[in-house]
A protein has these predicted regions:
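Short aromatic-glycine-(Arg/Gly/Cys) micro-motifs in beta-strand/loop hairpins
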Residues: 23-52, 65, 77
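Basic side chains
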Residues: 7, 19, 37-38, 63, ...
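Mixed-charge, Lys/Arg-enriched low-complexity segments
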Residues: 1, 46-79
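Short N-terminal "domain-start" leader segments
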Residues: 1-34
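A broad, low-specificity signal for short, low-complexity segments enriched in glycine/proline
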Residues: 11-15, 40-41, 70-74
Length: 79
C-alpha cells in the first residue's frame, strides 16, 4: 500500500508551545483514498486523530495541501 506523509511542527519556548501535526495520504482496503491527520504535543502520544475518506488520490492530496496551508498560517513549519 502506498503512503505519503508530512510532519509539521510549531515550537515557541516563549509561549510554551511544542506541537506537531502529521498528515498521511494512503489508499484504503476498499480502493478509496484517505487523508489521516494526527496532532498533539511533541514528545507525547497524539491527542487527536481524524480520517477523511476521498474518492481519488488527487482529492486527498488537495485536502492535504489545504491543511498544510492552514497549519503554516498558524506558525507550523515542515520538518
Amino acid at each position: 500500500m502506498e503512503m505519503k506523509s508530512i510532519r509539521l511542527e510549531s515550537i515557541n519556548p516563549e509561549e510554551n508551545r511544542a506541537r506537531f501535526y502529521v498528515l498521511y495520504v494512503t489508499k484504503t482496503l476498499w480502493n478509496t483514498w484517505a487523508l489521516l491527520r494526527r496532532w498533539g504535543q511533541i514528545g507525547q502520544e497524539a491527542r487527536g486523530v481524524r480520517m477523511d475518506e476521498c474518492a481519488t488520490e488527487e482529492e486527498a492530496l488537495q485536502r492535504a495541501a489545504e491543511t498544510i496551508d492552514l497549519r503554516m498560517r498558524h506558525r507550523y513549519m515542515v520538518k
